[in-house]
Amino acid sequence: MSRSETLFANAQKHIPGGVNSPVRAFKSVGGTPLFFKHAEGAYVTDEDDKRYVDYVGSWGPMILGHSHPDVLDAVRKQLEHGLSYGAPTAMETEMADLVCAIVPSMEMVRMVSSGTEATMSAIRLARGFTGRDSIIKFEGCYHGHSDSLLVKAGSGLLTQGVPSSAGVPAAFAKHTLTLPFNDIAAVEQMLNEVGQDVACIIVEPVAGNMNCVPPAPGFLEGLREQCDKHGVVLIFDEVMTGFRVALGGAQAHYGVTPDLSTFGKIIGGGMPVGCFGGKREIMQHIAPLGPVYQAGTLSGNPLAMAAGLTTLRLISRPGFHAELTDYTTRLLDGLQQRADAAGIPFVTTQAGGMFGLYFSGADDIVTFDDVMGSDADLFKRFFHLMLEGGVYLAPSAFEAGFTSIAHGDAELKLTLDAAERAFAALK
């Protein structure tokens, strides 16, 4: 029995399912989840001392690679001054200034401790600002595990094969209107019917929780136009795309400006951080300035601020995102070539340093139905073959993959060699 198998058996005694986030349980791909004990650069090492090229990156935050020395040094330095104060710090202001400089739509920002907190708070703020109750989200998009957003969500819920979560009251769900992603005509029709009741539209500008689905041409622009027409707050959930698709996020990459944005993952540099922000006239409705309440004991935690500030400064260097995107493109081109050579139906998607892998004969992946039409069983086999070859992919056919600046030619060769063997075995 492997060390991971032993640890997983022990974990299930007191942790539901043996994991603290459902997708980690390997239910979608089968087998025993790997328990990791070390991570450095582009690699993670499991409890049995096997090393893998990592394309999960802690589900997105590790854009610099694991254990970047500058980030570790910043955290060590802060450790000497204390773990948490529950009071304002200079670093919070530095972080707010930097985020607002990088993302021009962010005129004011509030720090929280997770992406879920960020999206939950942004929606409450939009409701308080507009005085309206309903929200629009998109099928397959995941915005955290708050009650009103677990309606036809993506991510772990797609992995489990259920459209929503038990425990969500119907009274909550009735205010959440769900439309097809990349279908601007459906948005226009809905807003023409009930726009006066809609507080906000929340969208992942790149749908990264039903694998990786970029926006169709005109979709984001159409959302902006429709929100302006009906007085609806447009929220970009950039927890995944922020600082990754481009330094300024998907809104910079696609040239569409939201009213509010949410960020997470990279902003914490591996520590638990999220934030939401946007137009000053909206943000001034947050307590203590306004009537919309939001608070958090660990919001702006100094250790997290130290890690996040260092990360954002490092990724701000000229050429960083071009290098990240180039590696990702070479990776996907190499995978496609090897799948084609093996006669395996396969298509990839990309947005900067995030990507999607689909076992599908479709020309492109644009809609939720396109995602669901891919062969999850073939992915399951591919996942385990790649794992045997020393490559760790997301353990679900419905999760995006991530590259880091630590991935280089050696990691690319190892990955493509493993993929060539895996595709051959799938014939």
From Swiss-Prot:
<comment type="similarity">
    <text>Belongs to the class-III pyridoxal-phosphate-dependent aminotransferase family. HemL subfamily.</text>
</comment>
<comment type="subunit">
    <text>Homodimer.</text>
</comment>
<keyword id="KW-0627">Porphyrin biosynthesis</keyword>
<keyword id="KW-0413">Isomerase</keyword>
<dbReference type="InterPro" id="IPR015422">
    <property type="entry name" value="PyrdxlP-dep_Trfase_small"/>
</dbReference>
<protein>
    <recommendedName>
        <fullName>Glutamate-1-semialdehyde 2,1-aminomutase</fullName>
        <ecNumber>5.4.3.8</ecNumber>
    </recommendedName>
</protein>
<comment type="pathway">
    <text>Porphyrin-containing compound metabolism; protoporphyrin-IX biosynthesis; 5-aminolevulinate from L-glutamyl-tRNA(Glu): step 2/2.</text>
</comment>
<dbReference type="GO" id="GO:0006782">
    <property type="term" value="P:protoporphyrinogen IX biosynthetic process"/>
</dbReference>
<dbReference type="GO" id="GO:0042286">
    <property type="term" value="F:glutamate-1-semialdehyde 2,1-aminomutase activity"/>
</dbReference>
<dbReference type="InterPro" id="IPR004639">
    <property type="entry name" value="4pyrrol_synth_GluAld_NH2Trfase"/>
</dbReference>
<dbReference type="InterPro" id="IPR005814">
    <property type="entry name" value="Aminotrans_3"/>
</dbReference>
<dbReference type="InterPro" id="IPR049704">
    <property type="entry name" value="Aminotrans_3_PPA_site"/>
</dbReference>
<dbReference type="InterPro" id="IPR015421">
    <property type="entry name" value="PyrdxlP-dep_Trfase_major"/>
</dbReference>
<dbReference type="GO" id="GO:0008483">
    <property type="term" value="F:transaminase activity"/>
</dbReference>
<dbReference type="InterPro" id="IPR015424">
    <property type="entry name" value="PyrdxlP-dep_Trfase"/>
</dbReference>
<keyword id="KW-0663">Pyridoxal phosphate</keyword>
<dbReference type="GO" id="GO:0030170">
    <property type="term" value="F:pyridoxal phosphate binding"/>
</dbReference>
<dbReference type="Pfam" id="PF00202">
    <property type="entry name" value="Aminotran_3"/>
</dbReference>
<dbReference type="GO" id="GO:0005737">
    <property type="term" value="C:cytoplasm"/>
</dbReference>
<feature type="modified residue" description="N6-(pyridoxal phosphate)lysine">
    <location>
        <position position="265"/>
    </location>
</feature>
<keyword id="KW-0963">Cytoplasm</keyword>
